[in-house]
Amino acid sequence: MHGDTNATFAVGEIDNESRELIKVTEECIWRGIEAVKAGRPLSDIGRAIEDHAKLHKLGVVRAFVGHGIGEQFHSDIQVLHYYDARNSVVMRPGMTFTIEPMITLGTWQHKMWDDDWTAVTADGKRTAQFEHTVLVTETGVEVLTGGTGAVSGFSPFSK
């Protein structure tokens, strides 16, 4: 079985705008995780993330999405981090997928470097990203990559 997680960390001194971007991005992932409920569409996750980002006048990179995960590292489920009613797959107990919003100070559009790996926002503004692997349960959600230290003060699960 596979798991997938990542986080953004400040290295050295950073400006207040970058610090706020990291904080709001982490809040966004927990808003998305909180929206995981059996019987609800995946679009609820995107709505929760996008609404919180917009509240802080930030954008959501659209080209990179969460994915189904389990025996295969990437499976067919796509978890958008912005609202799109067409993302109507209904969450069912036993489903596992990642939630991994990339939040930006600027445009949601991106461009690829010549190395065919590195992606940057089209306007060159900074981004931050957090990711967890989650399991839909009968009563809500289990954060599978939420081991010791992974659940922060922004998490509704830390209270």
Where are the regions that the model predicts?
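Active-site neighborhoods and metal-handling regions in enzymes and metal-associated proteins
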Residues: 1-159
